[in-house]
Amino acid sequence: ERAKSVDFAHPHYCTGGQIAAYKDGPLTVSALTGKTVGVQLATTYADAAKKLKGLKNIKTYKGDPEAFSALRAKKVDAWISDKFTVKATLDKNPDAGISAGEMVFVERVSMILRKNNKTLEDKLNQGLAEVMKDGTYKALSEKYFKEDISCRS
């Protein structure tokens, strides 16, 4: 829908909805059958949870901290949120006994541009291609995120 009013540069990173649960909990989409998941209200993660078949219940929370607290308190079986939010939360809570699980969906994140601004779009795409090719993007990605966050496909 947005593509009708704006243009997008090539994706500069990939993220998406990721499951987090206790290590012996539902860490895959198929394992969520019959389970209750916590999500932040009015997000793509809440939308994705609604599309999952077989969930017992979806509990929505004001924010991810509340959803994570519900998981820690075992009020939900799993939490679905942004991959990097899950990673940062688990890094800050290493003794929680909670692990990152399977991705529910992938989001390819791109810069939004004014419609028909081909010059800017081409320059951004060229610059991104150059730093991808010479390894700069991967090096910075690994330095700050501990992994390559580029969209490889």
Spans of features found by a protein language model:
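Short helix-initiation/N-cap motifs at beta->coil->alpha
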Residues: 24-25, 44, 59-69, 73, ...
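Ligand-binding clefts/hinges and TM-proximal coupling segments of bilobed small-molecule sensing domains
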Residues: 44-61, 97-103, 128-153
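Periplasmic-binding protein-like
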Residues: 13-20, 87-129, 147-153
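Short loop->beta-strand "edge-of-pocket" segments that line small-molecule binding or catalytic clefts
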Residues: 29-43
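Short amphipathic alpha-helical coupling segments at ligand-binding clamshell hinges
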Residues: 31-33, 82, 116-130, 136-140
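Acidic, polar ligand-binding/catalytic clefts
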Residues: 1-31, 102-103
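Short helices/loops that flank or line small-molecule/ion binding pockets
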Residues: 5-7, 30-31, 51-52, 65-84, ...
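Beta->alpha turn/N-cap motifs
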Residues: 1, 22-23, 42-44, 63-64, ...
